[in-house]
Amino acid sequence: NGHEVGTHPYGYTPFSYDITDYVKVGEENMITVKVDHQTPSSRWYSGSGIYRSVDLTITDPVHVDLYGTKIETPNLKEEAANGTVNADVKATVVNESDTAQEVTLTHTVFPKGGDKEDEIGTATTEAQSIEAGERATIDAKVAVTGAELWSTEAPNLYTVRTEVKVGGEVVESYDTDYGFRYVKFHPDTGFSL
């Protein structure tokens, strides 16, 4: 709507801007993304343009921070042989409302492109209070059964859906893609994935 919200000097890293204060609710809005490449900014090919997706994300005042989900499987190699893998899921939740909120998270793991009903693991956290204007990282352990490992030959991917609940009501759903894989270094065979 004619306001510059921000600039980003480097094209190979993700970035986002909160445009809430510039949106005219109930009216037509113009959102412009512009590339202005007057001076080369790299020693490599300095072409320019938009070559990845540009997304408009609408969130509830209480939501998972952008790129706010971290998933780790520290014992994957040992646990995968038994069929159940314990995933440590950390989600950073932001409370942009005017009051403290009691937040509960439910993490559900299912094959990418599938439905939540195809879940192979789920966990719900205890309620946690997040003060107005604050953020909190909430930890959970999800027992995942039957996950197929990711490899270059079989790039199996899963979606970890994080549902944010306030007062028992789901106010946001945030998806993170994940592949269950581990790396190995060996003096004779080198690096393997």
What are these regions (language model features)?
Residues 23-28, 42, 100, 144-159:
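Short glycine/proline/serine/threonine-rich loop/turn segments at secondary-structure transition edges
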Residues 33, 107, 160-162:
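Hydrophobic/tyrosine-rich beta-strand signature of extracellular beta-sandwich/beta-rich modules
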Residues 36-42, 149, 165-171:
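Short acidic/polar inter-strand loop motif in beta-rich domains
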Residues 68-69, 75, 161-193:
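N-terminal carbohydrate-binding accessory modules
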